[in-house]
UniProtKB/Swiss-Prot annotation:
Site (Interaction with tRNA): H146, Q365
Catalytic center residues: C121, C222
Functional description taken from the UniProt entry: Catalyzes the 2-thiolation of uridine at the wobble position (U34) of tRNA, leading to the formation of s(2)U34.
Gene label: mnmA
Subcellular location per the Swiss-Prot or TrEMBL entry: Cytoplasm
Family: Belongs to the MnmA/TRMU family.
NCBIfam families tied to this protein: PRK00143.1, trmU
Keywords: ATP-binding, Cytoplasm, Disulfide bond, Nucleotide-binding, RNA-binding, Transferase, tRNA processing, tRNA-binding
Protein name: tRNA-specific 2-thiouridylase MnmA
Keyword Nucleotidyltransferase: no
The organism of origin for this protein: Rhizobium johnstonii (strain DSM 114642 / LMG 32736 / 3841) (Rhizobium leguminosarum bv. viciae)
A single GO molecular function term of this UniProt record: tRNA-uridine 2-sulfurtransferase activity
Annotated segments matching region Interaction with tRNA: 172-174
Enzyme Commission numbers on file: 2.8.1.13
């Protein structure tokens, strides 16, 4: 099948008017995915505008392989737009990105969490600010290079609305990072790559003659020089590097550390103690600057409590989770397939019971919810993990330890 024959089948955008009468803004990071989106939509006849956000500009991160939305990437996006013959605009969002993504990222680490800055970026800069700009430009849609599908809501209860679904390429599934996308945003957004494998995206980039066809994929934390997030956090929040104790779940002080920012839940290597038994980071007590460690079984988690829940079901969240709860599938890691779970709401909060236990779940991470485990699963939203419950004995030890006084 030729490129011209393939393009119309990839994305009709579901508009009731001709492509040439439809304006689409493409969020262009300077990478291969968003560049191919722009190329496909141009081929289909849409009125395409490319917009790149300058999000940061600090030293090594600008030219680091796998960065995005910095100096070299902006130039790449410009060159792609020249090749395609579409307008390209650059918007300076550096201050906004620092306030809504970088600073909260550092604050989350200080609080003992393991944050996901990509979700914050999608929530604020991309799907709020850029989306608003697209509307101001008279665009009918904002298209991105994310690997996720959207389509008309299959439920008769919500006619005219759109829904999110996992992509065809499960290895590139980005739905975990998009759980917080609101219904209003989903109705306006389009994801042309949802039905494509990554290999086909790169082939199309080569066929289109795009300079970014062989460019490396962006990394999860794009704004961190050399991938050393601790350097960014220490600069913004020096107290995150304050020393503290490494304590066993049973209360024994095993050693000291140089800052909780160097640890994450589930970590085994690099803890800095030798006890003759394998120990893992079980909890980060930010208040007392303690790194709490224990055996692997102390990491086993079957229940996670959520905050800032974004619900995308057809019923209200309260209706869906009433009674015995809402049977669904959940992902607590971006690389895992959705596993059976039940969503509940009661006086203790909103929580998800995981049928299969997970180890190393950290506060600040996400729990995304789905209708099924397969590629065609609908995305029901999700929430940020506020806390998790371990097996009873480990939970009891942790609560006792956190309630005990800490030596000055």
């Amino acid at each position: 099948m030729t490129q011209a024959e393939l393009a119309p089948s990839l994305n009709t955008l579901d508009f009731d008017k001709k492509p040439e009468e439809t304006r689409v803004v493409v969020a262009m990071s300077g990478g291969v995915d968003s560049s191919v989106v722009a190329g496909l939509l141009k081929q289909q006849g849409y009125d395409v505008l490319g917009i790149t956000l300058q999000l940061y500009d600090h030293g090594a991160a600008v030219h680091r392989a796998g960065s995005c939305c910095a100096g070299q990437d902006i130039d790449d996006a410009r060159r792609v737009c020249e090749t395609l013959g579409i307008p390209h605009y650059v918007l300076d969002y550096e201050k906004r990105f620092r306030e809504t993504v970088i600073n909260p990222f550092a604050e989350s680490y200080v609080a003992g969490e393991t944050p996901i800055p990509c979700v914050s970026c999608n929530q604020t800069v991309k799907f709020a600010d850029l989306l608003a700009t697209a509307k101001e430009l008279g665009a009918d849609a904002l298209a991105t290079g994310h690997y996720i599908r959207s389509g008309r809501n299959p439920s008769p209860e919500n006619p005219g609305r759109r829904a999110l679904f996992r992509p065809a390429d499960a290895d590139r599934d980005q739905s975990y990072f998009l759980f917080a996308t609101t219904q209003e945003q989903i109705d306006y957004l389009r994801f042309p790559l949802g039905g494509l494998p990554k290999a086909e995206t790169r082939r199309l980039a080569e066929e289109m003659g795009l300079v970014v066809a062989k460019k490396a994929d962006s990394q999860d934390i794009c704004f961190v020089p050399q991938g050393k997030y601790s350097d960014v956090i220490t600069k913004l929040k020096p107290n995150a590097a304050l020393a503290g104790e490494i304590v066993h779940l049973d209360g024994r002080v095993l050693g000291t550390h140089e800052g909780i920012l160097h640890f994450t839940i589930g970590q085994r290597r690099g803890i800095g103690i030798a006890t003759g038994e394998p120990l893992y980071v079980v909890f980060l007590d930010a208040r007392s600057r303690r790194v709490i460690v224990g055996p692997k079984e102390a990491l086993e988690t079957h229940r996670v409590y959520l905050r800032d829940v974004n619900w995308l079901g057809d019923e209200t969240l309260a209706e869906a989770a009433a009674g015995k709860g809402f049977a669904c599938y959940a992902k607590v890691r971006s690389t895992r397939a959705p596993a059976p779970a039940v969503l509940h709401i009661d006086a203790t909060g909103t929580y998800v019971d995981l049928t299969v236990g997970e180890a190393g779940i950290a506060p600040g991470q996400a729990c995304a919810l789905y209708s099924a485990p397969g590629d065609n699963a609908r995305v029901f939203g999700g929430g940020f993990i506020e806390r998790s419950e371990r097996e009873p004995s480990a939970e009891a030890c942790l609560k006792a330890l956190l309630a005990s006084p800490v030596a000055a």
